[in-house]
Amino acid sequence: MGLEISEEKIKSILPSTRYQGSKRKMSPWIYESLRKLDFDTVLDGFGGTGSVSYLFKMMGKKVTFNDILLSNYQTGIALIENNKIELHGDDVNYLIHENGFDYPSFIQKIFKDIYYLDNENVWLDIVIHNIYMLSEKYEGDVLRKKQALAFHALFQACLSKRPYNLFHRRNLYMRTANVQRKFGNKKTWDTPFDALFVKFCKEASDKVFSNKRRNIANCKNILEMKGERYDLLYLDPPYIRSKQDMPADYRSLYHFLEGIMDYYHWEEKIDYTKKNKPLIKNKRLWDKDSIEANFDNIFNNFQDSIIVLSYGDPGYPSVETIKELLYSYKNKVKIKKKEYTYKLNHSGKNGTKSYEVLIIAQ
């Protein structure tokens, strides 16, 4: 049955995030819905911010975090796989200062006036290079986990300084325009990058703990994961919300963070025809034509596991369609709903309620 954890403890312990679609706020409800299920090993197939994986880790489960994005994979290493490595004061000091290296100026040149101020772009080029150059101080697993903590902290700082916490358009003017604002956190936008980074380095290190299990972080396409056995599969996949034609493309929304993860080859992978300089698009694995077949493929591959799906209603495919797909492999399918409004989702104004849904199939 696992450990009993209070709602207050869950809310206070889970790492903060500025990632769109994070289940952090829903975690107490997810915990209450799943805590009586009989499982020990769990795969979080679309790990994202790591909130639900971290919850499972708190519950004492053996957790495998998986996400296809390299930036999210770093969070999985830092907070799920990592049981003891932290960033110490001398590490952070090394990361935020120039250390005599021949620093690149890639972000300063390519992303001028797009996402950050000039001095912030200089800072980013220095800190990113320093994170990679932690290899001068560490090696092996210690290096891997210290770099992951640093990248995780950097990504949180980067998101904090972005309007909507995204990289979907060239909108630096929203920070710099001298206008009355009804939204946005101007105080955070005006906070120096290094202050935000130091704060998130400390927070990330404070969140490192051991649940005495060998937890793992992967960076795989879940559609290709076959033959792996877990007691429970948790899915928070891309899906099509009401009135949308396509599921959210997280690689496009967070392309800047993905670019950082391939910093020294980033220049070769940019679509220079677009004003906001995103990465050249990959073939989409999740679209309106493939989404139903993708669900069926995953349910088939993991039919021996308890399958738990975080979903939205209204959405496409519908909850009823998902339920019918699951009945091809499972005898019992339970639906739980909770009314919820996302910050950037205003559909409730026209009388249409949105629900967070948990589909539990055994």
Give short role names for the model-derived ranges.
Residues 41-112, 125-132, 148-151, 155, ...:
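SAM cofactor-binding core of SAM-dependent methyltransferases
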Residues 30, 42-56, 65-72, 227-247, ...:
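Conserved proline-anchored active-site loop of SAM-dependent methyltransferases
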